[in-house]
Every structure is written in C-alpha cells, then in structure tokens.
C-alpha cells in the first residue's frame, strides 16, 4: 500500500451559515451558483485535496441558513482554526463556518438528524423594506399573529401534509411529525417558527402562505385544519416566497455532542 492509503480518514462536522439570496439553492448544480459548490471549493483549498460534503437539509434557491450542518471525510490533519477561520477566508462573504467538531464514523449530517427547525420572517408593513430586503418576505396587509398562532396548532403531531406539499416533491410519503409551530410578532416582524422530524418539499413555505391568508382575515382560523384534512394541494394558498425562510437548527442525538450556537437569525432568541 502507498503512504496515502495508510493515512487515517477523519470525519468532520461543520455548522454553516449562509445568505441564500444569490444562490440557486444548496445543492451543487452545473453552471449555476450553489452554496455547496462554494463550501466544497473552500474546504478543498484548506485540505489540499478534493472535499465533498453531505448536508442536513438541501435548501431551495433564495432560502437562508443559520444552522445548516454538514459532514465530510478527509485524510488531511488540520487544526480547528484551519477548518473555521481558514475556510472562512476562502469563502464569499455570504457563507460562513460557525463551528467545527470531529465526529465518529457513524455520524451522518442527514441520516443522524432527528429534527429540523425553520423560521420564516415576514416584514408586515404597508411599504417594502430596503434594508435586509432579501432576508424577509414583505406582506403589506395587516396580519393578526395571534389568529395565525391559533390556526397553526392544528398542524402539530404526525399528519399527512399532502395539502402543503409541492407537486414535484419526491418524498416517498407525505407524513411528517410537527413538534411545534409558533407564530409571534416582534414589532413590524411576524415570525413563524416550526420544528418537525423532517419536511416535505416546500412544506414550510406552503404552510406560511396559508397562515398569511388566515392572518389577513381572508380565511377563518378553521381553514388550516380543513386544508390538512383535505389532502389537496390545490385548495391551499400560494407558496410563500423563499426570501423569508431560514434553516435555523438541526437536532442530533446527544452522544454526538455537537455545538449549539444561537439560532437567530439576527435578534431572534432561541
């Protein structure tokens, strides 16, 4: 065997934050910008060998992340500062490594995850924002966040989310277990916070689109429960825009002991 083949392989996990505004989603694609492509390029420069990453959840074009988790394997030995500060020095300003952790061989960023948590931020004022405009979704009609909160509670538990599932979704089943969903107002901002074991394609944005109809008074509070029972995507509201959506946290078994930095984004407390 060669000397290279004898080198031990290390599995490393990273926490990643990114502004998805200028990317065609997380996943590497030919001829378009992706978060994965930029991260793998920066990691490969630091490792001095090709690096491929696996992520906890592939976000769509325009969607952001403050709590994305990835893992990769390498024979390169580097200090933690190289995998954080060094990689960040090679990344564009809208992508950053938040933490690094050596993990055992049975850790997998996607398959070891037990839950994912998203936050959707709505800027609820008559006129659009100029600052952070790509990090929020503007909705000009007044929203009743308390009404939205009450309506949303019908989604908690294990349910068939066909009514909130994109037509092109490739998941084998529409059943998901929603652990919590909370709608809160912070001044001009309405935040929808939802955690589930996993999500079908566009599930959060489809739920938010329908909740905004309830919050604006266009539909009764009971409408969300009716949509869930109907199992018909055509009856629900339009998909909410990507700009306001953030993957903020991914849960793993405690034995992996991964860091838990503040979820955010920005001023939002855990």
From Swiss-Prot:
One of the protein's GO biological processes: tRNA pseudouridine synthesis
Positions with a binding annotation for substrate: 118
Active site: 60 (nucleophile)
A Pfam family: PseudoU_synth_1
Matching SUPFAM superfamilies: Pseudouridine synthase
Major enzyme class: isomerase
EC number: 5.4.99.12
Region of interest called RNA binding, as start-end residue ranges on this chain: 107-111
Region (Interaction with tRNA): 168-172
Name assigned to this protein: tRNA pseudouridine synthase A
């Amino acid at each position: 065997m060669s000397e290279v083949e004898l080198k031990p392989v290390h599995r490393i996990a990273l926490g990643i934050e990114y502004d998805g505004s200028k990317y065609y989603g997380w996943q590497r694609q030919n001829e378009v910008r992706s978060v994965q492509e930029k991260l793998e390029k920066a990691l490969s420069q630091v490792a001095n060998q090709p690096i491929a990453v696996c992520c906890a959840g592939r976000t769509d074009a325009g969607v952001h992340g403050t709590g994305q988790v990835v893992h990769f394997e390498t024979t390169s030995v580097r200090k933690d500062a190289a995998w954080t500060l060094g990689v960040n020095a090679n990344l564009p300003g809208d992508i950053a490594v938040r933490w690094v952790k050596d993990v055992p061989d049975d850790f997998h960023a996607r398959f070891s995850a037990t839950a994912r948590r998203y936050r959707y931020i709505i800027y609820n004022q008559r006129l659009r924002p100029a600052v952070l405009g790509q990090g929020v979704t503007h909705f000009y009609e007044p929203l009743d966040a308390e009404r939205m909160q009450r309506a949303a509670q019908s989604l908690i538990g294990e349910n068939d989310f066909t009514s909130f599932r994109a037509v092109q979704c490739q998941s084998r089943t529409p059943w998901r277990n929603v652990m919590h969903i909370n709608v809160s107002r912070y001044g001009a901002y309405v935040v929808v916070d939802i955690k589930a074991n996993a999500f079908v394609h566009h599930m959060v944005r489809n739920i938010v689109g329908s909740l905004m109809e309830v919050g604006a008074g266009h539909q009764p509070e009971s409408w969300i429960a009716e949509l869930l029972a109907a199992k018909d995507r055509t009856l629900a509201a339009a998909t909410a825009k990507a700009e306001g959506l953030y993957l903020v946290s991914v849960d793993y078994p405690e034995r992996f002991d991964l860091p838990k930095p503040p979820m955010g984004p920005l001023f939002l407390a855990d």
